[in-house]
């Protein structure tokens, strides 16, 4: 039976009296019922027949408890009666049952006189008896001394005997009376002063102790015990009484028993008392003792805990190295270190730690100083963009510088991520060319450039104004951007303002030239921003502000880059982003400025928005709106199908831009990546055609995306408005941002996008018209980028380190 804990030995071992007399039904502990009756406290129980009367003797409660739960054989009937007898086979059972029934508890014992045999219960219990476990180990009440003498010393004590510490005056070199060998000692009493055990014996090893123990048992426990307790003075007598000398004797000071003497010693002792008197004998004995001590027979603390000198130390096994470095020399350069090279990596320099450290130190102290490889222009590119108000011309130079710088940066970054940077570089270069071509077209746009140029270089200033303009056009968006771009707001709003209000148109008007410029501007930023966008959405979602800045900065190059980059950027953009991010970092200032007007205000709103949108749509938007037409139419076519999905997605996406845009972007990225590549290139370059086409495309996309725009516009419309104003492309990015960034960027861009979104929803209506389509497309265009955003996102990380200060600081407002 599986009884609970009560039956465990630990419980069974408790005092039986307490167990039995407890008023709880512990008797489960008993394995056989008879045990219940054999209380240690109760008088010896009579045989079962009388037993039933007997139980009264036991304390009633205990009796009742014991009996009720597991009655003894004698009491089974009583239990049966108590429980209410089942009609018994014999007539006796019934009469007995009566009394039992009346008093189930204490009355049990007094109950029936009937023999145990008559009860049905008895049969039941008999059946139990069959299964009864082995007889219980419960101690019997009376103590039966065992035949073997009681061992007073427990095994524990034997195992942990006190060490045989020598007595204070015990010096082995001082002659002591020799101990007599077993034979002689048995015959004659010891003569002379009681001799302490020789040291060899005092320190006798445990084996000896064990032997002694065995012997101790033989001669007689009492003698051994007495000897153990005997004091030194009595030792003689004890020994005499005890019998053979080797009976274990516990010398008082020595914790150890005396054990049979070694043969040599026995001989010495055999010589008898005479020998004991002689000094020679003592010397011999001591010599013997010393030998024995030396022979490790002795045990003492010194010996016991002696270092194991004779054991050879284990020869450590050298584990085979798990990692076998490749035979060819390892390149200890990470993509990170490659990116932040102080100088162009010279093979020898790489190994020179001092130079390397100096390079890194300078890198961190002057993070924007790019390696010679990268060309300082990139550094300057960011600053000139900020500082130079030379608008388009400087912008051109800046774009070139930024692009070259970015290209260089990308080259440096290419070491770490070759493919992405390459794409970025190529796309940037292409974008630069496109941007330059547009710039040449847009040279007149210089003015616009001023309008947008401010966007480019003075964007902060212009953008300040632009924002108001943007505020007008992008007002809603800009206003939030105002917050982010607060400073930017004052100047650019004017520029962008008109641009933005009309951005589709104004941007057209602004774009007309600026569009050209913007195409370049946007194209570069678009590029970067395209990449930025992807990143920005990611980066921008976090970095939105930064991105905005970055994007702003990105936009300049990105616009250029992005023109092409849109195509590549979609591809490159993801990769580009890192570089763009880097570029953007530096570019941020300029870009922010460059696109600042457009982007800055938008950057923040549109920061994300501008980048991509800036790309295709930035340039494309004004003219590109037309431009984007083709692009859009192609993308829209590509994306239109996508758009429908994306529109749905994007509408959803706008709402849940990330979702849709993620998906939308994917497709759009694909389509627009493809489409954009062509269109972007074309768009930047072909802006006119595409613009026209895009216009139609936009319109159609608007239709396709119109729905999307509405939702997207709703979500992204805000973006779109900004984008519309800033740039269709911008819209794209916001879609990105919105798709991606919107959730997060919305945070950063929330001020930018969300508020602008809200404001721009109104704006959206206006921009939505032209750019609604453009936006959708940009959404799509950027949508595609969005997909890449994921790809870019890692890159954004790279980016973050580079331009983080600018991005975060500037955009943090």
Curated annotation (Swiss-Prot):
Region spans: Mn 2: 153-176
Phosphotyrosine PTM positions: 143
GO terms for cellular component: axon; cis-Golgi network; dendrite; Golgi-associated vesicle; microtubule; perinuclear region of cytoplasm; transport vesicle membrane
Annotated region described as Mn 3, given as residue ranges: 298-321
Sequence segments annotated as region (Calmodulin-binding): 126-140, 162-176, 189-203, 306-320, 357-371, 384-398
Post-translational modification as stated in the protein's UniProt record: Palmitoylated. Probably depalmitoylated by ABHD17A, ABHD17B and ABHD17C. During neuronal polarization, palmitoylation and depalmitoylation cycles regulate MAP6 shuttling between secretory vesicles and microtubules, and its polarized distribution in the axon.
Residue positions where Phosphoserine is found in the record: 102, 187, 812
Bias kind Basic and acidic residues: ranges: 121-141, 149-173, 367-376, 420-439, 637-651
Mn 1: region residues: 118-141
GO BP terms, alphabetized: cytoskeleton-dependent intracellular transport; dendrite morphogenesis; lysosome localization; microtubule cytoskeleton organization; positive regulation of axonogenesis; regulation of microtubule cytoskeleton organization
Lipidation (S-palmitoyl cysteine): 5, 10-11
Region Disordered, residue ranges: 36-283, 314-651, 756-813
Organ and tissue specificity: Expressed in brain (at protein level). Expressed in spinal cord. Isoform 2 expression is up-regulated in the prefrontal cortex (Brodmann's area 46) of patients with schizophrenia (postmortem brain study).
Superkingdom as given in the UniProt entry: Eukaryota
Function: Involved in microtubule stabilization in many cell types, including neuronal cells. Specifically has microtubule cold stabilizing activity. Involved in dendrite morphogenesis and maintenance by regulating lysosomal trafficking via its interaction with TMEM106B. Regulates KIF5A-mediated axonal cargo transport. Regulates axonal growth during neuron polarization.
UniProt-recorded name of the protein: Microtubule-associated protein 6
Species for this entry: Homo sapiens
């Amino acid at each position: 039976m599986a009884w609970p804990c009560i039956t465990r030995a630990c419980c069974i071992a408790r005092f039986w009296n307490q167990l039995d007399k407890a008023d709880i039904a512990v008797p489960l502990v008993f394995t056989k019922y008879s045990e219940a009756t054999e209380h240690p406290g109760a008088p010896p129980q009579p045989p079962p027949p009388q037993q039933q009367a007997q139980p009264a003797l036991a304390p009633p409660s205990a009796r009742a408890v014991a009996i009720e739960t597991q009655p003894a054989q004698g009491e089974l009937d009583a239990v049966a009666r108590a429980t209410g007898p089942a009609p018994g086979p014999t007539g006796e059972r019934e009469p007995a049952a009566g009394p039992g029934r009346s008093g189930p508890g204490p009355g049990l014992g007094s109950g029936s006189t009937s023999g145990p045999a008559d009860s049905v219960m008895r049969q039941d219990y008999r059946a139990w008896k069959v299964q009864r476990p082995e007889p219980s180990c419960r101690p019997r009440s009376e103590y039966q001394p065992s035949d073997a003498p009681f061992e007073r010393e427990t095994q524990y004590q034997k195992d942990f005997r006190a060490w045989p510490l020598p007595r204070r005056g015990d010096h082995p070199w001082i002659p002591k009376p020799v101990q007599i060998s077993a034979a002689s000692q048995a015959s004659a009493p010891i003569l002379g002063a009681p001799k302490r055990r020789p040291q060899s014996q005092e320190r006798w090893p445990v084996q000896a102790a064990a032997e002694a123990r065995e012997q101790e048992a033989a001669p007689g426990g009492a003698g051994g015990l007495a000897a153990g307790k005997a004091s030194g003075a009595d030792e003689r007598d004890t020994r005499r009484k005890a019998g053979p000398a080797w009976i274990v004797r516990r010398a008082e000071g020595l914790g150890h028993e005396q054990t049979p003497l070694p043969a040599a010693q026995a001989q010495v002792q055999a010589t008898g008392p005479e020998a004991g008197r002689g000094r020679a004998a003592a010397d011999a004995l001591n010599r013997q003792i010393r030998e024995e001590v030396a022979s490790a027979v002795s045990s003492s603390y010194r010996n016991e805990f002696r270092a194991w000198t004779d054991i050879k130390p284990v020869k450590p096994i050298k584990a085979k190295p798990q990692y076998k470095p490749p035979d060819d020399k390892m390149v200890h350069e990470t993509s990170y270190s490659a990116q932040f090279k102080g100088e162009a990596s010279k093979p020898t320099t790489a190994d020179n730690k001092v130079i390397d450290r100096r390079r890194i130190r300078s890198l961190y102290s002057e993070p924007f100083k790019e390696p010679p490889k990268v060309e300082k222009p990139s550094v300057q590119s960011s600053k000139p963009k900020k500082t130079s108000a030379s608008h388009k011309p400087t912008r051109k130079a800046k774009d070139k510088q930024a692009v070259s710088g970015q290209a260089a940066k990308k080259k440096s970054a290419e070491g770490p991520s070759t493919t992405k940077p390459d794409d970025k570089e190529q796309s940037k270069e292409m974008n630069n060319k496109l941007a330059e071509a547009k710039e040449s077209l847009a040279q007149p746009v210089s003015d616009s450039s001023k309008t947008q140029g401010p966007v480019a270089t003075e964007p902060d200033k212009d953008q300040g104004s632009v924002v108001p303009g943007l505020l007008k056009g992008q007002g809603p968006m800009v206003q939030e951007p105002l917050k982010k771009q607060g400073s930017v707001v004052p100047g650019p709003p004017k520029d962008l303002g008109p641009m933005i209000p009309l951005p589709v148109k104004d941007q057209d008007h602004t774009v007309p030239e600026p569009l050209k410029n913007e195409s370049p501007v946007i194209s570069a930023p678009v590029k970067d921003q395209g990449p930025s966008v992807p990143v920005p959405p990611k980066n921008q979602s976090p970095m939105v502000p930064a991105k905005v800045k970055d994007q702003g900065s990105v936009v300049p190059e990105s616009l250029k880059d992005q023109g092409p980059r849109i195509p590549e950027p979609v591809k490159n953009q993801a990769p580009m982003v890192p570089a763009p991010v880097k570029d953007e970092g530096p570019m941020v200032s300029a870009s922010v400025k460059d696109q600042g007007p457009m982007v800055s205000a938008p950057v923040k709103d549109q920061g994300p928005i501008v980048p991509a949108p800036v790309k295709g749509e930035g340039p494309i938007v004004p003219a590109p709106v037309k431009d984007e037409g083709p692009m859009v139419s192609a993308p829209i076519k590509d994306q239109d199908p996508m758009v429908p999905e994306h529109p749905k997605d994007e509408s959803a996406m706008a709402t849940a831009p990330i979702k849709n845009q993620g998906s939308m972007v994917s497709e759009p990225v694909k389509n627009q990546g493809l489409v954009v590549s062509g269109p972007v290139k074309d768009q930047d370059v072909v802006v006119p055609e595409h613009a026209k086409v895009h216009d139609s495309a936009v319109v159609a996309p608007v239709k396709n995306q119109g729905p999307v725009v509405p939702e997207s516009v709703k979500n992204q419309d805000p973006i779109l408005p900004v984008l519309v104003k800033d740039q269709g492309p911008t819209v794209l990015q916001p879609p990105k941002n919105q798709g991606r960034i919107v959730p997060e960027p919305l945070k950063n861009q929330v001020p930018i996008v969300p508020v602008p979104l809200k404001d721009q929803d109104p704006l959206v209506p206006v921009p939505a018209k032209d750019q609604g389509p453009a936006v959708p497309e940009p959404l799509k265009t950027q949508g595609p980028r969005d997909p890449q955003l994921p790809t870019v996102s890692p890159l954004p990380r790279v980016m973050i380190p580079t331009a983080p200060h600018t991005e975060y600081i500037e955009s943090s407002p």
